[in-house]
Amino acid sequence: MGYQATIKKQGLLAIFDIKGDASAVAKRLSKLGFSVPENKNMAVEKNGQHLCWIGETQWLLLAPAEKEAQLLDSLVPHDPALDCRVVLVSDAYSFFSVRGNQADDILAIASPLDIRRINFPDNAASYTELFGIRGLVLRRQNGYSIAVERSYADMVSVYFNKVLTGKG
């Protein structure tokens, strides 16, 4: 049994792990024209960049790779007095896109996350388990973006292929 979906490994992204209270993070990101999402486990998008609120005091900023140096200069000024931490983690993650009419079915096999739209609406973002490992799931138009630690990317790719083709 095959599914009406496509799964593709994505190219590199600039990824920043940001930790701190919401007011400190909002202040830091205001320089980029971002405001933090109104609710946890949600993302906001601006100019192809996505800010995901993924924990009580944790955010991820995802941006095109070519913006990494510019964002690093803006987000990590040489001022240790600021009360949030920003760590560049671009090399830590690999991203996959899962798109198509049956993207929900694919994700339901890969993860125990309740992806019904009432619980996981457009622009939702959450860490969950994917094939037994920790992964980030972002609801996108017609599907999902999924991030896993880079060392697991080949394994996750094989698992996704087995699910997609029904061979495994």
Walk through the language-model features, giving the residues of each.
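Basic, glycine/lysine-rich polyanion-binding surfaces/domains
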Residues: 1-168
